[in-house]
Regions:
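Short strand-edge motifs at loop-to-beta-strand transitions and within beta-strands
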Residues: 54-58
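Extracellular beta-rich ligand/substrate-recognition surface
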Residues: 44-53
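Beta-strand-rich recognition domains
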Residues: 7, 11-37, 42-44, 63-129
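Positively charged n-region of N-terminal signal peptides that target proteins for export
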Residues: 1-5
């Protein structure tokens, strides 16, 4: 009985603080995406041709530290054969989740016929206590 009381006393005095779980899911990548956490590359999709519907998920939690974390998403247009010179179509769609709930998102597509390598870049802040 004493050990049960001690257990609950410890739980009350020292509550377990759970770190939120963060992930990102990409549903469109045309043609290649890079994800950086605090300026460290944590994901490279490689080239994806044909703009298919995707369900690529990445657990961000192992890369996050206490305090403010910067998540940067970059989209590269083109293909392995340097088709970015003439490829004016690009698209990206993704959603960031905190404990399974939508936290933030990004969606853009070529509206101006822009060609080139990095055609999209967006930053998101994630704060951990």
């Amino acid at each position: 009985m004493k050990s049960i009381f001690s257990y609950w006393l410890i739980c009350f005095l020292f509550p377990v603080i759970q770190t939120p779980d963060y992930s990102i899911t990409f549903s469109k990548i045309d043609n290649r995406v890079y994800a950086f956490v605090n300026d460290e590359l944590v994901f490279d999709s490689q080239f994806i041709d044909g703009n298919p519907e995707l369900n690529l998920s990445l657990d961000l939690s192992p890369f996050l530290k206490k305090g403010t974390n910067l998540l940067k998403i970059q989209l590269e247009n083109g293909s392995k054969l340097n088709a970015f010179i003439v490829d004016s179509h690009w698209m990206i769609r993704y959603e960031i989740f905190e404990n399974g709930e939508s936290y933030d998102y990004g969606y853009e597509s070529s509206k101006n016929g822009q060609t080139g390598l990095i055609v999209y870049e967006k930053e998101h802040n994630i704060y951990l206590e």
